[in-house]
Amino acid sequence: MILNKVAKCYGKQIGFFGNKTTQFIKPNQTIFLIGGTKRLFTTQQQQSPKKEEPKSEQQKKVEDKTEEKEKEKDEEENENEKEKENEDGEGQKKKSKFNVPPIVTSVTSTFFAGVLVASTFGYLTYNFKKDISEEERYRLNSVESKFYHSIAEPFREFFDNIFENLRTKYEFFDMLFGPGKIHKVLPPPLPGGKKYTLVIDIDALTEITKTSKYPTLYKRAGLDFFLDHLRKDYEIYLYFNGNIPQNKYEQLQFKIDTNGKYFTGLLYPETGIKERNQFSKKIEMLDRDPSKVIFIDAASPYDHPNVINIGKFKSNSKDKLLIELLPVLESFSRKNLDDVRPEISQFQNISKQSLTKNLEDYLSTHNINSRQKK
């Protein structure tokens, strides 16, 4: 503002006003006297750009290196981004491949839920009034008694039978769960009773026809003589296998032992003394000393330390094995053997013909008189 006033008052003297032309100084302009000439400059005079100094070779090299490094970094970042994108794409593809249909998940969850419910129900049913006495059974109310007798007890027996069969078939069951509980199938031996026990399959003693309503029984040669002599030193038990109907047991027993003097007792398939048509090796269930137990079987030969297999009897055959075997068994009790198993090992896993020969050799070797010669 001050400069404008000065210009107005002394413009002519300074020389800014000439030829009747008036020039006013703007607020942002300044008057300078340069080389005898008057020039008008703005306060915001633009400075001329400075000339760039030439760069040295070292600076150029440094700049080139930095540029190369930046390019490399950019390239690495681009590659990493591409790899991540590829990985994400592959992951999505895998996820899409392994996507489980909803129906499968629903079926699986339903199955496992059913297994859980069934196992819980089975466990509770198995343990329902498991080890109660007869008096406690009598005190059960009507609902408990009906559930106990119609569901719990049959289910428990069914499960125990399956488990025992698996335990017998697969040894690792004993390793996992320990030896099973052995149920005694015979009463305890009487003090001062007979020292040896003989268990005979009915097929080894007789042939039973099933062509009529009333079965016909054919006795093996020398059966009565065989049993009558051995009953003095042996407990003799007759085993009824699963081929014979249960309602025929008493009838057949009466035909074999009319006076009831031969057999100490009877054994049935339910006792488990035979497994898959073979006498069990768990002789402890007889509650007798295993070293003094002999099984006489009619099945195909198999490995068992206590079994003498004499084969099935056929009524049309001339079979005298019982008469040949009798003196051998009598010699065991007469010698008061502590263990019969080493003696009977030479009569195992052989055919009928070989058994007859081995019996004769045993009698001659031990100077035992044959009943057949008498």
Swiss-Prot record:
<dbReference type="GO" id="GO:0005744">
    <property type="term" value="C:TIM23 mitochondrial import inner membrane translocase complex"/>
</dbReference>
<feature type="domain" description="FCP1 homology">
    <location>
        <begin position="191"/>
        <end position="332"/>
    </location>
</feature>
<dbReference type="Pfam" id="PF03031">
    <property type="entry name" value="NIF"/>
</dbReference>
<keyword id="KW-1133">Transmembrane helix</keyword>
<keyword id="KW-0813">Transport</keyword>
<keyword id="KW-0809">Transit peptide</keyword>
<feature type="region of interest" description="Disordered">
    <location>
        <begin position="42"/>
        <end position="97"/>
    </location>
</feature>
<dbReference type="InterPro" id="IPR004274">
    <property type="entry name" value="FCP1_dom"/>
</dbReference>
<feature type="compositionally biased region" description="Basic and acidic residues">
    <location>
        <begin position="81"/>
        <end position="93"/>
    </location>
</feature>
<feature type="transmembrane region" description="Helical">
    <location>
        <begin position="103"/>
        <end position="125"/>
    </location>
</feature>
<comment type="subunit">
    <text>Component of the mitochondrial import inner membrane translocase complex.</text>
</comment>
<feature type="compositionally biased region" description="Basic and acidic residues">
    <location>
        <begin position="49"/>
        <end position="72"/>
    </location>
</feature>
<keyword id="KW-0496">Mitochondrion</keyword>
<keyword id="KW-0653">Protein transport</keyword>
<keyword id="KW-0999">Mitochondrion inner membrane</keyword>
<keyword id="KW-0811">Translocation</keyword>
<comment type="similarity">
    <text>Belongs to the TIM50 family.</text>
</comment>
<dbReference type="InterPro" id="IPR023214">
    <property type="entry name" value="HAD_sf"/>
</dbReference>
<dbReference type="GO" id="GO:0030150">
    <property type="term" value="P:protein import into mitochondrial matrix"/>
</dbReference>
<keyword id="KW-0472">Membrane</keyword>
<keyword id="KW-0812">Transmembrane</keyword>
<dbReference type="InterPro" id="IPR050365">
    <property type="entry name" value="TIM50"/>
</dbReference>
<protein>
    <recommendedName>
        <fullName>Mitochondrial import inner membrane translocase subunit tim50</fullName>
    </recommendedName>
</protein>
<dbReference type="InterPro" id="IPR036412">
    <property type="entry name" value="HAD-like_sf"/>
</dbReference>
<comment type="function">
    <text>Component of the mitochondrial import inner membrane translocase that mediates the translocation of transit peptide-containing proteins across the mitochondrial inner membrane.</text>
</comment>
<feature type="transit peptide" description="Mitochondrion">
    <location>
        <begin position="1"/>
        <end position="48"/>
    </location>
</feature>
